[in-house]
């Protein structure tokens, strides 16, 4: 008669007890299933799109891209943020459930980049609108750098306490700037307001009669030189 053979698992596994805290269990579940909301407005987002391929395979980190902010707990901003897009970004962030995280990817997102030079329509840093957890510099950052930023965010999540994060978000709110616009008269009739037209100071301060008298007294050879 053949003897009864027990499975290998029953023969080798001993009784064991796993102890943990609810906070550690919550952190482990969140860092293992980060669902990012992809907010790409410029060329940096192309580098993040390459992570979806088989070469980098960002699915191993539990990243599942979502198209709705109510189903995401991570927003990854990549590219230039303009003044017109700023309210939409803040609205998307406010619609995300707690706890939520932000990764600022690229120089244009962190500081405005080259597009913020003498520009009135570019936000010089996304941290002026929403709180940022990880800054990822570069123009554009490589996919390996994006993976490193996600790894650092996972380490941050594993060490945090949920109550402390909610308290800090309620106290340390990000600041916003109120822009005031001057409403002018309608210009559809062709009558432009002279106050809105730019006049160089070196010609506007000189009377027209004096300017033309000086121009007629100077020869063409002197004007060229």
Curated annotation (Swiss-Prot):
Subunit structure: NDH is composed of at least 16 different subunits, 5 of which are encoded in the nucleus.
Subcellular location: Plastid, Chloroplast thylakoid membrane
UniProt name for this protein: NAD(P)H-quinone oxidoreductase subunit K, chloroplastic
Keywords of the record: 4Fe-4S, Chloroplast, Iron, Iron-sulfur, Membrane, Metal-binding, NAD, NADP, Plastid, Plastoquinone, Quinone, Thylakoid, Translocase, Transport
Recorded name of the encoding gene: ndhK
Catalyses which reaction(s): a plastoquinone + NADH + (n+1) H(+)(in) = a plastoquinol + NAD(+) + n H(+)(out); a plastoquinone + NADPH + (n+1) H(+)(in) = a plastoquinol + NADP(+) + n H(+)(out)
GO biological process: aerobic respiration; electron transport coupled proton transport; photosynthesis, light reaction
PANTHER family linked to this entry: NADH DEHYDROGENASE, NADH DEHYDROGENASE [UBIQUINONE] IRON-SULFUR PROTEIN 7, MITOCHONDRIAL
Positions with a binding annotation for [4Fe-4S] cluster: 43-44, 108, 139
Cofactor note: Binds 1 [4Fe-4S] cluster.
Alphabetical list of InterPro entries matching this protein: NADH_UbQ_OxRdtase-like_20kDa, NADH_UQ_OxRdtase_20Kd_su
Entry's family note: Belongs to the complex I 20 kDa subunit family.
Function of the molecule: NDH shuttles electrons from NAD(P)H:plastoquinone, via FMN and iron-sulfur (Fe-S) centers, to quinones in the photosynthetic chain and possibly in a chloroplast respiratory chain. The immediate electron acceptor for the enzyme in this species is believed to be plastoquinone. Couples the redox reaction to proton translocation, and thus conserves the redox energy in a proton gradient.
Gene3D superfamilies: 3.40.50.12280
